Amino acid sequence: MAAHRSWLLVSFFLLEVLLLEAAKILTISTLSASHYILMNRVSQILQGGGHDVIKLLYEGGDIPDFRKENSSYQVINWRLPEDQQKTFENRWHRLIDEYAYGRSKYHTLLKIHQYFADLCSHLLSRKDIMELLQKENFDLVLLDSMDLCSFLIVEKLGKRFVSFLPFQFSYMDFGLPNAPLSYAPVYGSGLTDQMDFWGRVKNILMFFHFTKKRRDIFSQYGNTVQEHFAEGSQPVLSDLLLKAELWFVNSDFALDFARPLFPNTVYVGGLLDKPVQPIPQDLEDFISQFGDSGFVLVALGSVVSMIQSKEIIKEMNSAFAHLPQGVLWTCKSSHWPKDVSLAPNVKIMDWLPQIDLLAHPSIRLFVTHGGMNSVMEAVHHGVPMVGIPFFGDQPENMVRVEAKNLGVSIQLQTLKAESFLLTMKEVIEDQRYKTAAMASKVIRQSHPLTPAQRLVGWIDHILQTGGAAHLKPYAFQQPWHEQYMLDVFLFLLGLTLGTLWLSVKVLVAVTRYLSISRKVKQA
């Protein structure tokens, strides 16, 4: 039965590919390494699905190891002039340091978006690139919703687009549909779907706070919009988000909390999954030294790697030294402090085959920054985690990891060797974490369609139907007072109060009449 179903799905997929003419699709990637990796994979999948893909790539991003790949699709590169490029890179590094060690992360976040807005102005000013994109006459654009500039690019091109949300779906994140605040935690609240009374109070207050924060973030692009769009036709960013034909979400219900979704929202978490390859022999030899104890994989992402201080590296190295497991750590040798001796059970490398190591039978723990791509890879292979979240969606991802008993989270700023060691030992030795990880692995791998098939299938559907108007609820066009039924509530409240007032008046009048009648009879 299962084999028959699989053949039907494959046949349906092949038929769709044969019937659909190749479309010209633009993908946009202007953010950091993890975003590049994901959009690179999306572009490869669409190209492999029979479409003609062109990617707009900002070369100034932190993606040195991946830019050298031979792409199956065409790439349009752009970068700032050399004098400005260095200035922008220094500004970016200062902002990341400020976010890590400064007091006000919120104000630093606004500065980061102002940085992206300034970068956006440079891109929109490049007439050669914008004219080239116009000339290509794309059938569809697929953009990263974290890159707000891409919405302005699409508006300039006047093309239909699909939005890719690279992290967790949260209430009113980026124009996506809402869900009841009683069980849908607001982004940044640190809450799960199981809230007590005070948790629900916090959640609704966070809703108003997040709404303001979202408005403040969008306002950073105000000058960019005024500079590049004629007065009278200047778009509102929040309105542009609602124009998306589809929303692809880089998550899976093996990790995320269950919630209602609109028909134009599709979960495709796990796009980076690929066939497991044997690991290099030097890594296999290192792992074999530790026998049944196995090994720990450590990978903290590109942003965290930028701000790892000497003290943090020293504390982590000290904790690893007391583990019976071997430790494979993605850490550039150029970042390693000269006065810190590498623990004998630790091997550092500039790059490690993360997916292949997560699939290795001897892995016992994954120490991660909590980025969505890394978390989804760990879920796919059933590996427990210790998370050190720092930036963006990472804390929210680790809230879900902890809620599902897939691991434990600790803070980068307060990381100490002793507590870090105890946390790692707890996750390795307590079987409930491994049991939960294996259960999530089954959920993750038992979908009837792979994430790639879902992605291509829904893109083809949009191309065949000429858009997704049939998937968008009328709520997208309603004013907020109608959407939240405030006008109906006020009408019913007024009707109820009016009826009560009238009833009281009638009762008073009747009582007075009866009282007067009684007095007349007595007289």
From Swiss-Prot:
The record places the following residue ranges in the Cytoplasmic compartment, namely: 509-523
Chain ranges passing through the membrane: 488-508
Group of enzyme by EC: transferase
| Signal sequence interval, chain numbering | 1-22
Q: Name one GO molecular function term.
A: UDP-glycosyltransferase activity
Recorded E.C. number(s)? 2.4.1.17
Q: Which residues are glycosylated?
A: N70
Alphabetically sorted, this entry's keywords are:
Glycoprotein, Glycosyltransferase, Membrane, Signal, Transferase, Transmembrane, Transmembrane helix
**Please, one GO biological process term?**
cellular response to genistein
This protein's membrane topology, according to the annotation, is: Single-pass type I membrane protein
Pfam name, any one: UDPGT
Q: What is its main location?
A: membrane
Family statement: Belongs to the UDP-glycosyltransferase family.
Instruction: Tell me, in a sentence or two, what this protein's role is.
Output: UDP-glucuronosyltransferases catalyze phase II biotransformation reactions in which lipophilic substrates are conjugated with glucuronic acid to increase water solubility and enhance excretion. They are of major importance in the conjugation and subsequent elimination of potentially toxic xenobiotics and endogenous compounds.
Give the protein's recorded name.
Answer: UDP-glucuronosyltransferase 3A1
